[in-house]
Amino acid sequence: MTQLASAVWLPTLLLLLLLFWLPGCVPLHGPSTMSGSVGESLSVSCRYEEKFKTKDKYWCRVSLKILCKDIVKTSSSEEARSGRVTIRDHPDNLTFTVTYESLTLEDADTYMCAVDISLFDGSLGFDKYFKIELSVVPSEDPVSSPGPTLETPVVSTSLPTKGPALGSNTEGHREHDYSQGLRLPALLSVLALLLFLLVGTSLLAWRMFQKRLVKADRHPELSQNLRQASEQNECQYVNLQLHTWSLREEPVLPSQVEVVEYSTLALPQEELHYSSVAFNSQRQDSHANGDSLHQPQDQKAEYSEIQKPRKGLSDLYL
């Protein structure tokens, strides 16, 4: 379960971090829609955060939904002008104002109020912006004439969705695809890849978990035996050593031989002889226990002859 949770939450966390870095996830503050009449002037106020106080601000026109054509931008000064559009930064109150002069019906479109963010500012170079829908309506002032008037048909004018950029004929105007528009397709590709990895990892982890559950349900006794064997795996083997004795082998007798000596002592007389006899006790023990298979061939006796002692030495023998 721990591996399953980590496999699901890790891609989700990466996705949330990437969404946090998307342009517009920390938007500027301002109106979402503005409306003006033909020939009038229109001002839009955009508020930004204090950390963007020293950054350049710009106003651009959205093209093809993903590109933004730069109209006017504050590069080094707090105020810039391009044709009928003026932008002025107010660092004291953290706002900048965009002013349109002499609105026309072709000015109706979608615009962006944005702050220029460099690549080394910790936001991966994604600019902060928000979109504004600008609509322009015809002027309502009636045209009066002193003579008889003729009824003229009312012509309904529809607002165009696209139009030329303002101030395109002025010197120094830059009309190009802004860098944030170029980054957006790559960003969408990364998002799609992360979503694919998230779904694939989740399905794989869930499938592995289901397989384990199915195996445990089909063979409950096998899983129980395996658990018992794993718990008792240290006592499964015993080393046994057997010692055998050959039937042909005779028991080992003591290496030392006990010798019993018999001696007879008597008072010294003439022509007396003394003898001592020694028998092997090893042979007697083997006869008593029945372990010997053969009778001894002969018995050896040792004799010692003692002559009559000299006179005066008889007391020594006694």
Curated annotation (Swiss-Prot):
Cysteine pairings via disulfide bonds: C46-C113
Composition bias type Low complexity, residue spans: 139-148
Residue ranges, compositional bias (Polar residues): 284-296
Membrane topology (UniProt): Single-pass type I membrane protein
Modified residues (Phosphotyrosine): Y303
Main location: membrane
Pfam families associated with the record: SIT (PF15330), V-set (PF07686)
GO biological process terms on file: establishment of localization in cell; mast cell degranulation; negative regulation of mast cell degranulation; negative regulation of serotonin secretion; receptor-mediated endocytosis; serotonin secretion; serotonin secretion by mast cell
GO cellular component terms, A-Z: plasma membrane
Location of the region described as Disordered in the Swiss-Prot/TrEMBL record: 139-174, 284-318
Keyword field: Cell membrane, Disulfide bond, Glycoprotein, Immunity, Immunoglobulin domain, Membrane, Phosphoprotein, Receptor, Signal, Transmembrane, Transmembrane helix
Intracellular or extracellular location(s): Cell membrane
Tissue: Present on the surface of the majority of myeloid cells and a subset of B-cells. Present on the surface of NK cells after IL-12 stimulation.
Residue ranges, Extracellular side: 28-185
PANTHER family, per the entry: CMRF35-LIKE MOLECULE 8, POLYMERIC-IMMUNOGLOBULIN RECEPTOR
The family this protein is said to belong to: Belongs to the CD300 family.
Chain's role: Inhibitory receptor which may contribute to the down-regulation of cytolytic activity in natural killer (NK) cells, and to the down-regulation of mast cell degranulation. Negatively regulates the Toll-like receptor (TLR) signaling mediated by MYD88 but not TRIF through activation of PTPN6.
Protein name as catalogued: CMRF35-like molecule 8
Source organism per UniProt: Mus musculus (Mouse)
Lineage of the organism: Eukaryota, Metazoa, Chordata, Craniata, Vertebrata
